[in-house]
Each structure stands twice: as structure tokens, then as C-alpha cells.
């Protein structure tokens, strides 16, 4: 009896932990998007102008993300916090 209860407890705890590890994709629009980005990016160092590549190089190597923005990725479709973090800095 004790062994089966312990086994069930271990299963329940592992399921709860695995559910927390999975990041849920959500939509972020308007003020909610701006506030979430501000909270996530707080303290992230901004890039200076000298760190930017020339325009022609940037457009060539950015790929499809260069044509989309944070609104396209997170308002029109659900996105994760990792995607939002990629827009910091």
C-alpha cells in the first residue's frame, strides 16, 4: 500500500513539473504587448549604432524574420516568451 501511494505521488509530481517546463504560446497585442516587452527587456543592454551592420548586409542575411515584426509573430499568431525575448536589445 505504501509503495503504491509513493509511486503515485512521484508520478503526479513529475507530471506537474513537466507541465511547468512547457512554455505556452499566447497572443500579445497592443498595450499588453508593449508592457510585456518592457517587463521582459528591463535591464537588457541596448545595442549601439556601431554594432549595427550596413543596411544591405542586414537585409540580405536576416531571412524571413527581417520581413516580420513582433506584432506579426506575437499578435497575429501566438508566440512564446522566448520569441518576445529575442526582440530585446
Swiss-Prot record:
Gene Ontology MF term list: growth factor activity; hormone activity; insulin-like growth factor receptor binding; protein serine/threonine kinase activator activity
GO biological process per UniProt: positive regulation of activated T cell proliferation; positive regulation of insulin receptor signaling pathway; positive regulation of MAPK cascade; positive regulation of transcription by RNA polymerase II; positive regulation of vascular endothelial cell proliferation; regulation of muscle cell differentiation
Keywords, alphabetical: Cleavage on pair of basic residues, Disulfide bond, Hormone, Secreted, Signal
UniProt xrefs under InterPro entries: Bombyxin, Bombyxin_B, Insulin-like, Insulin-like_sf, Insulin_CS, Insulin_family
Record's signal peptide: 1-19
Principal location: secreted
Propeptide regions on this chain: 48-66
Disulfide bridges in this chain: 29-75, 41-88, 74-79
Annotated Gene Ontology cellular component terms: extracellular space
Subcellular location as annotated: Secreted
Family stated for the protein in its record: Belongs to the insulin family.
Protein task: Brain peptide responsible for activation of prothoracic glands to produce ecdysone in insects.
UniProt miscellaneous comment: Silk worm has two kinds of PTTH: 4K-PTTH and 22K-PTTH; there are many forms of 4K-PTTH.
Self-association state and partner proteins as the record states: Heterodimer of a B chain and an A chain linked by two disulfide bonds.
Record protein name field: Bombyxin B-1
Organism annotation: Bombyx mori
Amino acid at each position: 500500500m505504501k509503495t503504491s501511494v509513493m509511486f503515485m505521488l512521484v508520478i503526479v509530481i513529475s507530471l506537474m513539473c513537466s507541465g511547468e517546463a512547457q512554455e505556452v504560446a499566447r497572443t500579445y497585442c497592443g498595450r499588453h504587448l508593449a508592457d510585456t516587452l518592457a517587463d521582459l527587456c528591463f535591464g537588457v543592454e541596448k545595442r549601439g549604432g556601431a554594432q549595427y551592420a550596413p543596411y544591405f548586409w542586414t537585409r540580405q542575411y536576416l531571412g524571413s524574420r527581417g520581413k516580420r515584426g513582433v506584432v506579426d509573430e506575437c499578435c497575429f499568431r501566438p508566440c512564446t516568451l522566448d520569441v518576445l525575448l529575442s526582440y530585446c536589445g
